[in-house]
């Protein structure tokens, strides 16, 4: 058996192990689990669309734990500023500026309710997604590798939101629509 075939078989085996491990915690969202894992392995990002209570945060946390990756959750709100997610320079005791990294400096970032924050902050996140780096005070800072964003949106509440334009939606590999689990899955 060639090395390529062996590598592919090992990958498939590991992928199935991850999927089964995550499925022990997240029930009834098999397609979402598949798409999120594929997106991570392909160095992409995901947008999850679903009402509250469908275990979106638990899904991301479980995936991060099973892959052994760092995880940060950012709750997007109307008053969130780009520096709140990117980080900022502060003056230290030696009167020198020091960059303090924001929550974007993690392997997996949950951008919860991305459409609740103004376009300026959305743009800072989308720049990080595209460039895998952020800019602060004219300096470029590279993000941790791997870097994966899972953003969520609530499809019901549209009042007080800032919809993502088509060009920004294009940054996501998958737009995953989550639905309620079946009665049998709920019992499980």
Q: What is the predicted function of each stretch?
A:
Residues 75-80, 173-184:
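Conserved AAA+ ATPase "SRH/arginine-finger" region at the nucleotide-binding site
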Residues 37-77:
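Walker A/P-loop
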Residues 51, 85, 152:
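P-loop (Walker A) phosphate-binding loop of NTP-binding proteins
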Residues 81-95:
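Conserved NTP-binding/hydrolysis module of P-loop NTPases
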Residues 98-107, 136-153, 164-173:
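AAA+/SF3 P-loop NTPase mechanochemical coupling elements
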Residues 35-38, 91-110:
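Conserved alpha-helical scaffold flanking the Walker A/P-loop in AAA+ ATPase domains
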Residues 8-54:
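Pre-Walker A (pre-P-loop) alpha-helix and adjacent loop at the N terminus of AAA/AAA+ ATPase modules
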Residues 83, 106-130, 144, 159-168, ...:
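Conserved AAA+/SF3 P-loop NTPase catalytic/coupling segment centered on the Walker-B
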């Amino acid at each position: 058996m060639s090395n390529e075939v062996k590598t592919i078989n090992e990958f498939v085996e590991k992928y199935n192990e991850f999927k089964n491990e995550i499925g022990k915690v997240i029930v009834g969202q098999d397609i979402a689990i598949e798409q999120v894992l594929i997106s991570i392995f392909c160095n992409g990002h995901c947008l999850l669309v679903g009402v509250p209570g469908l275990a979106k945060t638990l899904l991301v946390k479980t995936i991060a734990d099973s892959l052994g990756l760092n995880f940060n959750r950012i709750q997007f709100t109307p008053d969130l500023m780009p520096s709140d997610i990117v980080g900022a320079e502060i003056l230290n005791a030696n009167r020198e500026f020091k960059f303090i990294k924001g929550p974007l400096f993690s392997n997996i970032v949950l951008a919860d309710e991305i459409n609740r924050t103004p376009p300026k902050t959305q743009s800072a996140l989308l720049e990080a997604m595209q460039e895998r780096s952020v800019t602060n005070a004219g300096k470029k800072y590279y993000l941790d590798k791997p870097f994966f964003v899972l953003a969520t949106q609530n499809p019901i509440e549209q009042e007080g939101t800032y919809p993502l334009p088509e060009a920004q939606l294009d940054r996501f590999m998958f737009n995953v629509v989550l639905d309620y689990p079946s009665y049998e899955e709920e019992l499980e």
